[in-house]
């Protein structure tokens, strides 16, 4: 699938796959940002995209950043709709007790393109019964 990217900032790094078979490309920060403990920050990538209709871009955490630094994407996955043309930003949250320093050029998240299915919604008086019923939120044990 083809994705058209616009560099909005000279420090913007064009995302690329790190390994054959990867599902996501890495997004990079364009400037340093300090994220205080247990706080969030919007990290700029310096990129805008022309996303094909029928798809969306999802912003997902980088596992190493989450495991080693306790820093992750807050609204994961973040959704970038096909009709959005602004700068791609990444909301990071620092779950640690120390300040996390985002450095310019640092890989901060992954971006994945996925197909979108639109809903045809029908309002009904009742939904069908299943063996699970209304059981949820730990109903099968923890």
From Swiss-Prot:
Residue positions binding substrate: 62-64, 75, 79-81
Entry keywords, A to Z: Hydrolase, Magnesium, Metal-binding, Nucleotide metabolism
InterPro entries noted in UniProt: dUTPase, dUTPase-like, dUTPase-like_sf, dUTPase_trimeric
Cofactor field: Mg(2+)
Enzyme class name: hydrolase
GO process terms (BP): dUMP biosynthetic process; dUTP catabolic process
Coiled coil location: none
Protein role: This enzyme is involved in nucleotide metabolism: it produces dUMP, the immediate precursor of thymidine nucleotides and it decreases the intracellular concentration of dUTP so that uracil cannot be incorporated into DNA.
Protein name: Deoxyuridine 5'-triphosphate nucleotidohydrolase
Native source species: Picosynechococcus sp. (strain ATCC 27264 / PCC 7002 / PR-6)
High-level lineage: Bacteria, Bacillati, Cyanobacteriota, Cyanophyceae, Oscillatoriophycideae
């Amino acid at each position: 699938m083809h994705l058209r990217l616009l560099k909005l900032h000279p420090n913007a790094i064009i995302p690329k796959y790190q390994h054959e078979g990867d599902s996501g490309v890495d997004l990079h920060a364009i400037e340093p940002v300090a994220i205080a403990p247990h706080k969030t920050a919007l990290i700029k990538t310096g990129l805008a995209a022309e996303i094909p209709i029928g798809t969306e871009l999802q912003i997902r955490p980088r596992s190493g950043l989450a495991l080693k630094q306790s820093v992750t994407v807050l609204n994961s996955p973040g959704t970038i709709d096909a009709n959005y043309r602004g700068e791609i930003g990444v909301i990071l949250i620092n779950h640690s007790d120390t300040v996390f320093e985002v450095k310019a050029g640092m890989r901060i998240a992954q971006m994945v393109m996925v197909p979108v299915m639109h809903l045809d919604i029908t309002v009904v008086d009742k939904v069908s019964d299943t063996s699970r019923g209304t059981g949820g939120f730990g109903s099968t044990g923890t």
